[in-house]
């Protein structure tokens, strides 16, 4: 198993936080990392360690994005006008896999990536199988007709653990969603605190 495909709950345990707010997370029962040394008391992190942890947590949240891809997103964020940390969040939220997850078409961000790869999703009426595809404001995302009644989709629609954020207009009767606006950090329903400014500091060293 590659690091990118690391089990989602292992990420929770490594971070010591339930980063997606899921009821089955092992962190709900124990707050230590994976492995035989997971229960050792951790010392105070250095500034570098705190910044690195913030980066690992955000990368993990968005499906364990590869370092190369994540850094490319960061570079794009720094070239945009405005706050680089806010821009970073906005770019991550514009990813197709993120919107499919936010719209509650699938239960997890990992499932969103697989769902898209398998050709179940259309953008503005055309099939797109690239999870990192960057949406624009006004784009419509929908589950293709043959996939709308899949158990995975119907069960995800009913998940009580999270709501569809207000920057996405989702219609579960049609299994479609419209990307209304690019959110800021405060708009994104993270289950734990995310600190993109620390990631900017990390890469700016």
Swiss-Prot record:
PROSITE patterns: RIBOSOMAL_S4 (PS00632), S4 (PS50889). The keyword rRNA-binding applies. Keywords: Ribonucleoprotein, Ribosomal protein, RNA-binding, rRNA-binding. InterPro entries: Ribosomal_uS4, Ribosomal_uS4_bac-type, Ribosomal_uS4_CS, Ribosomal_uS4_N, S4_RNA-bd, S4_RNA-bd_sf. One of its GO terms (cellular component) is small ribosomal subunit. One of its GO terms (biological process) is translation. Residues 94-157 form the S4 RNA-binding domain. Gene3D superfamilies: Ribosomal Protein S4 Delta 41, Chain A, domain 1 (1.10.1050.10), RNA-binding S4 domain (3.10.290.10). It comes from the Bacteria. Residues 18-49 are annotated as: Disordered. One of its GO terms (molecular function) is rRNA binding. Part of the 30S ribosomal subunit. Contacts protein S5. The interaction surface between S4 and S5 is involved in control of translational fidelity. One of the primary rRNA binding proteins, it binds directly to 16S rRNA where it nucleates assembly of the body of the 30S subunit. With S5 and S12 plays an important role in translational accuracy. Belongs to the universal ribosomal protein uS4 family. This is Small ribosomal subunit protein uS4. The lineage of its organism: Bacteria, Pseudomonadati, Pseudomonadota, Alphaproteobacteria, Hyphomicrobiales.
